Amino acid sequence: MAKRIGVFVTIVLMIVPVLAIGLTLGGLFLAGTGSSEEAYEVFGSQNALSTGILLADTGGNAFMVCVLEEGSTQLISILPTSTPKEGLNTSFLSIYQKEGIDRLKQEIAKSLSLKVDGYLEVDFSGLSSVVDALGGMTMEGKTYTGQELEGYFQRPSTDQTTATAQQDVVLAVGRRFCSAGFWKGQKAFRKFMKITETDLSVSALMKIGKALIPALEGKNLQRACLPLEGNWNISTTALS
């Protein structure tokens, strides 16, 4: 039961912090799962927010790190076919397929020189049912079905253009959740439960979700794709 609750609230991070925080529904699932102390282990202290979360497609076609600091958010795509910054001559995709999510998290953290506190492992081949439960989604003036959006995650992001498009989908779905009604959002939550795993506690996810609200609104959000031509410097590859 605790695991299912944790999976439910993973939507707080990737897609829809507003619903998980703003609705009573989120509070109903808090009892007996996680604690404030666990949340502070992720964020450092009650008042200072600084954490990194890995978002991985189970097919290995998209890896992103969401880095939250007080007042700003970075969404960084890591090209799956690229190799770690130092020490290994094998791709992140191969590391994930052969050694799993924990080793991938470790190598990405080393390459970015950032702390990565947890992960969300999402089967994006199931995104269709989630989006359709929301009644479709509009992105850049066009309405997409869930099946159309799945296409963005059916091959590895080998360049900045593909990685940027994948980020666009994640952010757009988040905004769509924020505008969804309570019952429609609840239905989509149940769909999302079936395609997500996480190692984060509910209390930590709720804190992260609250911090992500400005980013979903387009405030203080920096986007990047790494590495580009071997360059791991985030500041020189900012997309926005």
Language-model features, listed with the residues they occupy:
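Non-catalytic, solvent-exposed segments at the cell envelope interface
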Residues: 2-240
